[in-house]
A protein has these predicted regions:
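N-terminal intrinsically disordered, low-complexity, charge/repeat-rich segments that act as generic
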Residues: 1-28, 34
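Short, conserved turn/kink motifs that form compact alpha/beta structural patches or helix kinks used as
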Residues: 21-133
Length: 133
C-alpha cells in the first residue's frame, strides 16, 4: 500500500454530564488517501462532490491506541482513537481543538465526514478502510 499522507481523526463522543458532543483528535501517520471527484447532472444543474477513500494500515505507529467504537464510547479517552460514522477526518496534521464539525470548515478545505468504514485487519494487507464525503 502506498502511504501518501498523514491525517487527523476527530472522534465524536457524547458527554453525559454536559449533554453535548465532545471531539478529540488523533494524528495518524502514513496512510493512503484517494479523493474521487464525482459529478452528476440533475434538474438543478451540475452537482459535484468529493468522495474520500482512506486506507489506514494496521502497522502505523498509532495502531496500538485503536479501540472499536463500542469500547471507545464507554472507555475511550485521551490517547485512544476509533473510526465510526460521523467522525471527521482532516487531510494532514491538524492541532486545532473543535467544538463542532463546522469549526473545521473555517480552517481547512480538505476534510470529510466518515460515512462508511470497515475493519480489514486480516489477510495479507491488514488495514482499516474509511469512506467519506
Amino acid at each position: 500500500m502506498i502511504k501518501n499522507m498523514d491525517v487527523t481523526v476527530y472522534n465524536r463522543k457524547y458527554d453525559e454530564t454536559t449533554h453535548f458532543d465532545t471531539w478529540s483528535r488523533t494524528v495518524l501517520h502514513g496512510v493512503h488517501v484517494y479523493v474521487d471527484h464525482k459529478t452528476a447532472v440533475s434538474d438543478n444543474g451540475l452537482n459535484s462532490a468529493e468522495v474520500y477513500k482512506i486506507r489506514i494500515p494496521a502497522d502505523i505507529p498509532e495502531a496500538d491506541q485503536y479501540l472499536p467504537p463500542e469500547e471507545y464510547a464507554c472507555c475511550g479517552g485521551f490517547g485512544n482513537w476509533t473510526i465510526q460514522n460521523g467522525d471527521q477526518i482532516v487531510l494532514g496534521e491538524c492541532y486545532q481543538e473543535i467544538e463542532k464539525p463546522a469549526d473545521l470548515k473555517k480552517l481547512f478545505q480538505r476534510h470529510c465526514k466518515v460515512t462508511s468504514w470497515s475493519d480489514n485487519r486480516f489477510g495479507t494487507l491488514p488495514h482499516w478502510r474509511v469512506g467519506g464525503e
